[in-house]
C-alpha cells in the first residue's frame, strides 16, 4: 500500500529531508529546485496517492504525524508550514503565491508573482477540496469545511467554511441550549433520587413494629 520513497526528486544536496519514517502512497511527487527549494517532512507523516509537493523556491515543512489524503497539491515559492498531527483530506490545493495581472498589455505569465507565507497550525483538519491561498494563517485546532477557500487569518480552534472561509463557530464555545438541557436533566435526576429516598424511608418506618 505504501512505499517509503517513490518519485523522490533530489535536485540539490538535502533538498528533500525526512526526519524519520515517512509513508508515501503511489505516484507521490516530492520535488525541490536545486539551490532554491527545500522540503522537510517530519516522522510518521502519511502522504496518500498522487500527491504533488513542489518547492520551486523557499521551503515546505510538514509536521510529525500529519496525514494527507490523495490528489493534493502544494506549491511553494516562499514558505509553507503545516503543523503536527493535521488531517489533510483529498484534492486540496495550497500555495504561497499569486500571479500579477495588473497590466492588461503584458501577458499574465510575464508579469511575475507576489508571495506571502502560509501557516497551518497543529491539529488542523482541512476538508475535501479546500484551497489555501497565499498569506493564509490557520490557527491550531481549526476545522475548515469542504470546498472552502482560505485567504487570510482563521483564529485558533475555529470551525470555518465558505468562499472566502469565515468562522462559523468556535470549538471552545459550549452551546447554551445544551447546557440548559443538561442542567434540567440533572435537576430532574436529583428530585427523582430525593423522592425515591423519601419513599424508601417511609416504607422502612411503616414496616418497623411498635415495641411499646
Regions found by a protein language model. Name each.
Residues 127, 133, 145, 150-151:
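Short hydrophobic beta-strand segments in globular cytosolic domains
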Residues 24-136, 163, 171-172:
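Flexible, glycine/small-residue-enriched loop-and-beta-strand segment within the central core
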Residues 1-14, 19-20, 85, 91-92, ...:
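Terminal amphipathic alpha-helical/low-complexity segments used for targeting or macromolecular assembly
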Amino acid at each position: 500500500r505504501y512505499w517509503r520513497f517513490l518519485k523522490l526528486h533530489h535536485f540539490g544536496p538535502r533538498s528533500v529531508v525526512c526526519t524519520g519514517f515517512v509513508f508515501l502512497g503511489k505516484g507521490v511527487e516530492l520535488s525541490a529546485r536545486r539551490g532554491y527549494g527545500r522540503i522537510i517532512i517530519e516522522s510518521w507523516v502519511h502522504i496518500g496517492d498522487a500527491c504533488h509537493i513542489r518547492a520551486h523556491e523557499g521551503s515546505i515543512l510538514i509536521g510529525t504525524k500529519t496525514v494527507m489524503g490523495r490528489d493534493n497539491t502544494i506549491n511553494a515559492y516562499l514558505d509553507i508550514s503545516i503543523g503536527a498531527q493535521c488531517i489533510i483530506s483529498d484534492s486540496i490545493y495550497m500555495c504561497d503565491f499569486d500571479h500579477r495581472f495588473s497590466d492588461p498589455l503584458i501577458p499574465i505569465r510575464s508579469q511575475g508573482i507576489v508571495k506571502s507565507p502560509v501557516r497551518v497550525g497543529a491539529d488542523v483538519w482541512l476538508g475535501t477540496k479546500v484551497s489555501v491561498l497565499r498569506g493564509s494563517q490557520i490557527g491550531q485546532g481549526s476545522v475548515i469545511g469542504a470546498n472552502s477557500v482560505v485567504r487570510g487569518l482563521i483564529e485558533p480552534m475555529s470551525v470555518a467554511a465558505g468562499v472566502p472561509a469565515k468562522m462559523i463557530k468556535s470549538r471552545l464555545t459550549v452551546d447554551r441550549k445544551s447546557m440548559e438541557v443538561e442542567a434540567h436533566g440533572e435537576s430532574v435526576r436529583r428530585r427523582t433520587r430525593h423522592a425515591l429516598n423519601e419513599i424508601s424511608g417511609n416504607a422502612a418506618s411503616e414496616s418497623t413494629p411498635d415495641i411499646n
